[in-house]
Amino acid sequence: MIRISDAAQAHFAKLLANQEEGTQIRVFVINPGTPNAECGVSYCPPDAVEATDTALKFDLLTAYVDELSAPYLEDAEIDFVTDQLGSQLTLKAPNAKMRKVADDAPLMERVEYALQSQINPQLAGHGGRVSLMEITDEGYAILQFGGGCNGCSMVDVTLKEGIEKQLLNEFPELKGVRDLTEHQRGEHSYY
């Protein structure tokens, strides 16, 4: 379910050494399955463990996950990265905003999942997002851009060189992608 690197485990163990005996960590998702989903890690004293929690045992600690958060933390990774600027704890949870779909799910659901878990996190850096409107009978994914992508002069490159290549590689049954957006350049546009 969750992978915690050795460096992150060592970091947590150091922090837990200063807590009440038996305290571990809790990994959770607030607003799971929504565009506003946020992941977090907190201390979990022994009296805060619920009967419905999943206990994930690691070499140096135990991570507790509540029943509601569990499916959204599938494939999550926690790491502790040190570089020339300092140290930072990272938590990547590709399924926090949307539950992972089965490999045999309908094409529409699989494409929507790819957009939400892989493509939109990249576009979010520019204040943008893309939504799947439909998949045509001819096999074209019809997309609509929003936020910083609407009116951006680079949207055609993003669509053809980024999104289309990635989706066609992952979903060979697609023939291409089309942009439904009526682009209006404004202060919200990234470029």
Curated annotation (Swiss-Prot):
Its cofactor is [4Fe-4S] cluster. GO terms for molecular function: 4 iron, 4 sulfur cluster binding; iron ion binding. Binds 1 [4Fe-4S] cluster per subunit. The cluster is presumably bound at the interface of two monomers. It holds the Pfam family NifU. [4Fe-4S] cluster binds at C149, C152. Keywords: 4Fe-4S, Iron, Iron-sulfur, Metal-binding. The keyword Iron-sulfur applies. Gene3D superfamilies: Fe-S cluster assembly (FSCA), HesB-like domain. GO terms for biological process: iron-sulfur cluster assembly; protein maturation. It comes from the Bacteria. Signal peptide: none annotated. Belongs to the NfuA family. Homodimer. Involved in iron-sulfur cluster biogenesis. Binds a 4Fe-4S cluster, can transfer this cluster to apoproteins, and thereby intervenes in the maturation of Fe/S proteins. Could also act as a scaffold/chaperone for damaged Fe/S proteins. This is Fe/S biogenesis protein NfuA.
